[in-house]
Amino acid sequence: MSDIFKLDKELVKQLVRLREDFGLCAVKAEFEAEGASFRDLVRLRRITIQQGIPLYLKIGGAEAIRDIKDAFELGVDGLIAPMIESPFAVAKFLNAYKSIYGDQKIFKSINVETRQAAENIEDLLKIAANSIDNITIGRTDLSQSYYDEKIQPDSEFMLNLIESLSQKVVDAGLTLTIGGSLTKTSIERFRGRSKEWAGKVTSLETRKIILPAGIMLEKHKALEESIKFEELYLQSKLEIAKMLTEFDRERLFKLKSRL
């Protein structure tokens, strides 16, 4: 039990460090790829709200009403819709959002992470303008959607594609986040495009942490400290799961002893 509280303190300490030293934009949680439970989200909401840090929830799809209801109950600060490929999907997300939140405004972002979405970007932005705040480019899925082994997240093709998309996003009045398997190599490649991306790419993200692009690219250990938060979060999550299953294990043993 003591390990859980110790990890919790380390988690908060790391969050504060990211806020104070690296300009932390927000913490992310996912119902989609991460498969977070409602309990996981409650913990993250408790920790982030105590420190005055925004929490964004990546829902399971454009029209994931159940996820949006959970987001409303938790009081998250933003919603992220994955795999948005068409103007219709943007409209579905906005309608689902309004069905729960009405006129209440929170941060809204959509993920461009397939070839189809990239090719439809201008049509997507026509619907998204004045309604969506941010576009996130998910490089991992986006590169895989081309079915070409030469096209990898850090490839020249992807860097050129991001540059092309970024100008269209900015022209539409939205901010731009880049994510998808960020590594030290990614950061080095991005630095080579820093002049071209200046004023276009707003932030960079790992699975859990969103930092300003300039800080992630230029400040020593920004990526390392972002990943450290996720490591602590996963360790804490595993310890809690271990504790909760231990109660069930003991109960099962008692039941068997009665037979």
Task: Outline where the language-model segments fall.
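Expand to "…catalyze enediolate/carbanion chemistry for C-C bond making/breaking, isomerization
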Residues: 1-259
